[in-house]
Amino acid sequence: VRASDNAADLGPQDYVIVTLKAHSVPPVVPHMQPLIGENTTIVSGVNGVPWWYFHKIGTDLEGTRLETVDPGNAQWDGFGPDRVLGCVVYPAAEVPEPGVIKHIEGNRFSLGEPDGSKSERAQAISKALSAAGLKAPVRPRLRDEIWVKLWGNLSFNPISALAPATLDVLCTDEGTRPVARNMMLEAQAIAEKLGVKFPIDVERRIDGGAAVGAHRTSMLQDLDQGRPMEIDALVGSVQELGRVTDTPTPTIDTVLALTKLRARSAGLYSG
């Protein structure tokens, strides 16, 4: 396997899999251009509402851009929405030290085209990932899965950073569980206006978080280790969608304000 910290050393690729924190992607788009050829597919495995969400969505919101996840249209213009293949990353992991990834649980990477088609490129990367021992189904309604995962990221991440607490605690505590529930219900109201169908209910989603155990969310890890916190894509984007769909988000607004202040106080957020 060839590796380099300079994309120009590698040249155009068939697939470029992007798994950075959402706020880290726009600044590196210019540096990734040597990897992108005429037929390159960008597999976007980034948490939060994806920058391409309204590409080929088939509604009157077609082409809507989200400033919270793609400031200045860096990805929309630099990658191009037609190149993108969506991906929902399920494994839980921690970074105990630079260069070391500790896998906690999970091996599923759901894939999906923005228009829901089972394209040749989606099936090809699915086959390659499956051959490596991973679960990589191609979904016709990937946005549904995006929201089910976002339910957790939207609520568990900021609450864990504010508390601070691990998943097993915040999902069962009599004070924080209702906060997570209210945030999820507000998000569900937004998503359903956008045509999303949830395969599970909020209580089951929270129970699923508790079942992961004493896991420290990525936002809590970032806070503890002094890294910039992924607030805009996980929480701010849902607030932005609330404004787009004219949906009230009082609990999300409150938790977002507190989380931003906590992060600013630690020097980990400048928005």
Residue ranges and their predicted role:
Residues S24-V25, K118, R227, P248:
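Alpha-helix N-cap/loop-to-helix initiation residues
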Residues P50-W52, E94, I146, G208, ...:
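Generic structural signal for helix capping and beta-alpha/helix-loop junctions
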Residues L35, W76-K149, S155, A161-P199:
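Internal alpha-helical scaffold of NAD(P)-dependent oxidoreductase catalytic cores
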Residues V169, R177-G271:
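NAD(P)-dependent Rossmann-like dehydrogenase/reductase catalytic/cofactor-binding core
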